[in-house]
């Protein structure tokens, strides 16, 4: 008799757990709902960051343009050299600041940075901005986090989801 009671009790508990599991799965969003929720949340973050950048540009009186990707740029000194093409080796002097104004990185005056345009290895926003330049140009780029180091930052000086400001001089192209 005790075995029967225990068996019935175990079956009842299993039934309750199984029913509870079904209700939980019904309440969980499907992949499409989850994707839509995450996209909406990400869009809110992007919109907030965009407004912060817009306010900063106005506060500083910078005459900047926003690209379709969200890069803000201003070429404040025009050079006379040739325009950058994908595949060129860009030689630049640069400084990077956070939106707070804190300078966090800069090129060595005796050793400019070199990178091949279009091959990665630098921030997406920097590559986009460099493609708008000519040799001798000096420019300011504001990279929202999705064009800079994204959610993780760089793990050293650039914090998570940070907007960064590049001041760049295109020294030469190879």
Model-derived regions, located:
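Cross-family detector of peptidyl-prolyl cis-trans isomerase
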Residues: 19-174
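Sec-dependent bacterial lipoprotein signal peptides
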Residues: 1-19
